[in-house]
Amino acid sequence: MTINITPISNESFNLNETSSTTINLLNHFDDPLTTGKVANFNLEDNSLGSGEINIVLFDQTGEGAPIAVNNFASYVDGGSYNNSIIDRSFSTSQSKYILGGAYTVENLEVKRITPNAPIEDEFSSQRSNKAGTIAMYKLTDEANSARNRWVFNVGDNPDFDTRGGGLTVFGQVLSPEDLNTLNAIASLPVTNTSLPVINPVTSSQFSTLFSRLPVNDNTIANDFNFPYPSYPFTEDNQFVRFENITIDNVLEFTFTVESNTDPDVVSASFDNQGNLILDYGSSLKTPLYRFQNQDLPGTYLFVGEQERQSILSNFRNFKEEGLAFKTASQANGDTIKTGETDITIKATNLLGESAQQSFKVSVTGDVPENENQDQLIRFNRFQNRDIPGTYLYAAEEESRNIRQNYTNFIEEGIAFYTYGADANLGQDIYRFQNTSQPGTYLFVGEEEKNSILANYPQFVLEGVAFEVAV
């Protein structure tokens, strides 16, 4: 895959005219396959692999398959795939796939998913049926005949590239963990059986032969000899069933600063809309990004750019929620200076492919004096040893109390410098404690504070923690 690039121009700024500038990086990097749509297949049995399958949907016009994605989304939005099952698992040395999208099971009642009109094929050899992809399935070799059925290519299936003009690949697994889940399903035992199936349109019932139906129970697998057993199931979870399938819109790239030759001239950060923020006129220009620990929902970590890159690469349980606020990295505030710096931005798409761009920034003007540098105070980071992966940020006075009285909090060092709660020099950041996870904290601005107070009673407001730039 090629990431399309539109060059970022060199920039020049005057300190006496502006203190920061925003550049929309989505105008300079484009993934030709996706706009950032991700489908989540949520398995009822979360012991199968990771319990879910995440798929990047190829909805971009041009190189993607927007007709197939829109067709798939119409079934998702209508709830048609809720409680849907994998109805066939096939594996040989030449082919390996699992098939779904045709039937639902609820209270042991099997129903046919009502198909919409067939869609136009969008097969491309650049989107072939390789391991980890999903395609619209056709029951025959007739072109333009795909409807509601889809197939996960667990292995490479070159035959699907020629069936009826080719099965249209419209997505790919987000990560190796998702492919592992596909393999876990494909490794389950299978059975051949006849099941009564209800047509919801006519309410009629008809017997249907299921060949190589994967089962979550070894006791009902069989050796494929006739006569096939009739309805050996006693529980819904003996089927491989998806509780639901949803589609989210996410940012199609993760952006990082690969290099910045003089961050004292310009600090580079990113918001969660794909904007690059260049700061050059503030003594609080060190960005802190917020991550939520998905293993402990409602617990958070705030980190700078270097630690952010390490988390993005190595700790998938921490989900980035975007730029939180800006502080200073040194006691007398971040340096404001004129000069030039060369910045390189790396864009990594949802499938892990990346591209880089470099550009130059020049800053001129008269450097203002930092009259408030003596108002900056130090905040330290503590990790709660009783709940690993959860953190507290405290000023020095509170830090002394924590060191003396709360040995479960392990000090990890200086987190940042910023203004105290009563300085009236920045924007207030409020501290909440999560009573569902006592000893865990969240730091938010005014707007999010009001939302939490209105909607999340488990978070208790403890007051203004500090003031920052945002």
Residue ranges and their predicted role:
Residues M1-S9, S362-E369:
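Short S/T/G/P-enriched beta-strand
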Residues T2-S20, L25-L251, D271-S282, Q330-I343:
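Cyclophilin-like peptidyl-prolyl cis-trans isomerases
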Residues N16, L25, V257, G304, ...:
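Extracellular/surface recognition and adhesion modules
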Residues D45-S47, T261, D295, L351:
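Solvent-exposed strand-loop boundary residues in beta-sheet-rich modules
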Residues L251-F270:
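Short, solvent-exposed loop/linker segments at beta-strand-coil boundaries, enriched for Pro/Gly
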Residues S282-N332, P368-V470:
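Extracellular glycan-binding segments that recognize GlcNAc-based cell-wall polysaccharides
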Residues A347-N349:
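Conserved structural position at the C-terminal beta-strand
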Residues E353-G365:
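C-terminal edge beta-strand
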